[in-house]
Amino acid sequence: RDIATSLFVVKALRKKGKKARLLFSWDEFDRLRKVPKNVQEINNDMEKYIGYPYVDVPNPFHDEAQSYAEYFEHEFMRSIDEFGIELDYRYQAQMYRSGKYSEQIIHALKKRGEIFDILDSFRTQDAQPGEREAYYPVSIYCPCCKRDTTKITSLSDDCTQATYTCECGHEGSFDFTKDFNCKLAWKVDWPMRWMYEGVDFEPGGKDHAAPGGS
C-alpha cells in the first residue's frame, strides 16, 4: 500500500507537468533485533548476529545474495519488476558508510538537547535525572564485535569527536567527520532523510500517530 499510494501521487504530479521521483529506501543499516522463526529453522546459529546491521548479517538462504539484507532486497525487487514500477532506490548502508550524512549527524548531535526535549514531550513517564545530558541520537557500530552495543561517554564541543565504550569490552574514539560506521536513531534518521533528499510526501499509517510512534 505504501508504494501504491506514493506511486499514484507521483503519477498525478507528473500529469500536471511536475517533476517527481519515487524514492524507496532500504533500511539495511538498521540492527538485527531478532531472528524470525523461519530463519531460525534454516540456521539456528543466527542469534549471534543480533546487533549487527542487516547488511553485515550473512545470508542464511544459500543463494547468490551476499547478505541477509540483500536476499530480501532481491525478493522485493523481483516482485516490483513484475508490476513495472520504477523506484529510485537508496541503500542506507551505502549512504551512511560513504559519509553522505556526516554533516546531518553532526547537526543532530549539536541539537541533541532540543531533540531530547521534543521526544520527551510525547513520553508518558518523566525523564530520569541526567537522562537528557546522556542522550545521544546516534549509535556507533563497534569495530570489534560489529554490534551497536556501544555507549558514547564524551563528546567534543564542536560535536565532531566522541569517545565510547562497548558491551564487548572495547573502548575507542570516533571522528564523525572521518568515521562513518554509525547510524542515527530512527526518529531522527527519518526526518534527516527527508531533509537530505528534499522529500515532500510520504504515506503514513495510524501506527505512526500512536503514542511512542514517529
What are these regions (language model features)?
Residues 1-116:
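N-terminal Rossmann-like or analogous alpha/beta NTP/dinucleotide-binding catalytic cores
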Residues 32-35, 120, 153-155:
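Short, solvent-exposed loop/turn and secondary-structure capping segments
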Residues 111-114, 125-214:
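Alpha-helical recognition segments enriched in aromatics with Gly/Pro capping
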Residues 118-124:
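Short coil/turn segments at secondary-structure boundaries
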